Regions:
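NAD(P)-dependent Rossmann-like dehydrogenase/reductase catalytic/cofactor-binding core
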Residues: 201-251
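Small-residue helix-packing motif on alpha-helices
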Residues: 30, 59, 192-199, 221, ...
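Short acidic-hydrophobic, aromatic-tinged amphipathic segments that line or gate anion-handling sites
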Residues: 51-56, 154-156
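Hydrophobic packing residues within well-ordered alpha-helices of enzyme cores
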Residues: 15, 19, 40-43, 78-82, ...
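Internal alpha-helical scaffold of NAD(P)-dependent oxidoreductase catalytic cores
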Residues: 101-111, 127-164, 175-215
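Rossmann-like NAD(P)(H) cofactor-binding subdomain of soluble oxidoreductases
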Residues: 37, 47, 55-61, 65-130
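NAD(P)+-binding Rossmann beta1-loop-alpha1 motif at the extreme N-terminus of oxidoreductases
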Residues: 1-54, 125-126, 187-189
Length: 251
């Protein structure tokens, strides 16, 4: 199974590195194309087994899976010079580019996947959304298997892609904003910035682990640490008075 990745930017490079660390696609079966040789040199310095090229058509020549890791406005331009064969699977990670738009470039018979990872993919901790068109159950499972090695992947209908992107791709920024705000509070209380960052980040990581590992509702875990008359309930009430929940929902 050979994979070509068009684009060696943040996402393309992270996917290539993740595949190289995984067990499904050998690094030697991954080819990355990018017009900027600097990005390719950095990638190959980390993973010498990965193949690199500045020519997109050369990258996809023998590929079974072609991953487009370019900005949405470059999709049509890239697809106009790379001509896919019917056996090749096209994977687009360009946000907002629909199957309808992709079909205009590659035709209605092509097997297509839309993927929305988030930036935690660089840490193999992405929440990746996957939708498919003209894909078999085996192809869908393969895509899930590949991206579950880069975090957690779920298969959803394209109609849910916009809403779920707000939870995952945008959501990671909202969590980081909370971390930043909590750090500022810690600094105001006299805690050194690096210490505050470590404390808050680990608390967020621990909270996520409670939900994922125990499969419980957040309200249950909140109740465990909310003592009547304690500081936690006072803080939670202050967040509610300030419109915290409403702001997250509206965002």
């Amino acid at each position: 199974m050979k994979v070509a990745i068009i684009g060696a930017g943040n996402m393309g490079g992270a996917i290539a590195r993740g595949l190289a660390q995984g067990t499904i696609i050998p690094a030697s079966d991954v080819t990355v194309a990018d017009p900027f040789s600097g990005s390719l040199e950095t990638l190959q310095a980390d993973y010498p087994e990965i193949n690199v090229t500045t020519e997109n058509p050369k990258a996809i020549k023998d590929a079974d899976i072609v991953i487009l890791a370019v900005k949405p406005w470059l999709i049509d331009q890239v697809l106009s010079v790379v001509h896919l064969t019917p056996r090749q699977v096209l994977v687009s990670i360009a946000g907002g580019v629909t199957f309808e738009q992709l079909v205009k470039s590659v035709g209605p018979e092509q097997t297509i996947f839309r993927l929305i990872p988030n930036t935690a993919i660089s840490q193999l901790e992405s929440m990746t959304l996957i939708s498919s068109r003209n894909a078999s159950k085996e192809q869908e499972q393969l895509m899930l298997d590949i991206f579950n090695e880069l975090g957690l992947a779920v298969l959803i209908p394209e109609s849910q892609m916009a809403a779920t992107t707000a939870l995952t791709s945008c959501g990671i920024a909202y969590v980081l904003k909370y971390i930043q705000a909590a750090m500022q509070a810690g600094i105001e209380l006299g805690i050194y910035p690096k210490d505050a960052q470590k404390m808050v980040a680990q608390s967020v990581k621990g909270a996520a682990s409670l939900i994922l590992n125990n499969d419980t509702h957040p309200a249950i875990e909140i109740d465990k640490v909310t003592t009547p008359g304690g500081i936690t309930i006072k803080g939670l009430n202050e967040l509610d008075h300030a419109g915290f929940t409403s702001a997250i929902i509206k965002a």
